[in-house]
Amino acid sequence: MKIEGSVALVTGANRGIGKAIATALLDRGAAKVYAAVRDVATVPTDDPRLVPVQLDVTDPAQVRSVADTLGDVEIVVNNAGIGRPATPLTATIDNARAELEVNYLPLLATTQAFAPTLAANGGGAFVNVLSVASWVGMPALATYSASKSAAWSFTNSARVELKHQGTQVVGVHVGFVDTDLTAGLDTDKIPPATVADSVLDALEAGASEAVVDELSRTVKAGLHDDQQLVYPGIEAQFEAARSTPAH
């Protein structure tokens, strides 16, 4: 996917990873980036190529309306996400539902709404910001991990379905990033700009995944091992995150 001259839409583009991706797209020559956020007043206005768009990703009708309006979009970055740290015994149905409604279901809504637009514009790409927690379920992140696992599974299905129309689908796996979600976490974190660079490199390379950091690479490398071998080491790395999700 060529970024220079392209038009992208990034959800949650007013902070953290989303803001970094929007900035990186512009730095690499994107013609326009729609910053899709709940409150457009939170989007900087110093670059005319960055266009605020009001969007609640949990409202499928609003997603469809935005897709119908923005017929020039070629890249859709599904970045918006929330986390409600809890164990299987302390999690609430309401919080688990909220995580699914932000972390998973918007991927379904945006894929259905924007796939025709991307096809009409030459194929384009979807980028779904997932998590290392997509691959491993940890007790303190039980429902968050489940929502990200659902998003990962859907991403894989969408990749197969959309291949016929020439649409690239990139899944982004990353551990601890220096954002609001990890503000209270005392552990090594990577800057959002590092995630953004990895995402855009994957896009331009035609890749299906961006495995951003060492934690994610370690987890992926161990996925084929017996769970009795994988989980002790992974759980130790996640111990510091018992109060804060990775992304």
Regions found by a protein language model. Give the residues of each.
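C-terminal tail/cap regions
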Residues: 188-189, 193-247
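Residue(s) in the substrate-gating loop at a strand-loop-helix junction
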Residues: 131
